Amino acid sequence: MGKLTILVIVAAALLSTQFMVQGDGDQPADRDAVPSDDNPGGTSEKFMNVQHGSGCPWYPWCG
């Protein structure tokens, strides 16, 4: 009976660590979701976003 108890405890510990590593997995809503466009202007506007305020890419040095 002692070996069975130890076996059950070890099995429970292994299952709990497996669930912790896997997490809850991908939900169907997450997989089918369309990624949002967080940069609608494209990469040029992403890197040159300093132009938006004054129209000058070198903002501190533009008169």
Curated annotation (Swiss-Prot):
GO terms for molecular function: ion channel inhibitor activity; toxin activity. PROSITE patterns: CONTRYPHAN. Residues 1-23 form the signal peptide. GO terms for cellular component: extracellular region. Expressed by the venom duct. Its main location: secreted. The keyword Disulfide bond applies. Keywords: Amidation, D-amino acid, Disulfide bond, Hydroxylation, Ion channel impairing toxin, Neurotoxin, Secreted, Signal, Toxin. The modification 4-hydroxyproline is found at residue 57. Disulfide bonds join 56-62. Residues 22-47 are annotated as: Disordered. The modification D-tryptophan is found at residue 58. It comes from the Eukaryota. Residues 24-54 form a propeptide. The modification Cysteine amide is found at residue 62. It is found in: Secreted. The cysteine framework is C-C. Exists in two forms, due to cis-trans isomerization at 56-Cys-hydroxyPro-57. The cis conformation is the major form. Belongs to the O2 superfamily. Contryphan family. Its target is unknown, but this toxin may modulate voltage-activated calcium channels (Cav) or calcium-dependent potassium channels (KCa). This is Contryphan-Lt2. It comes from Conus litteratus.
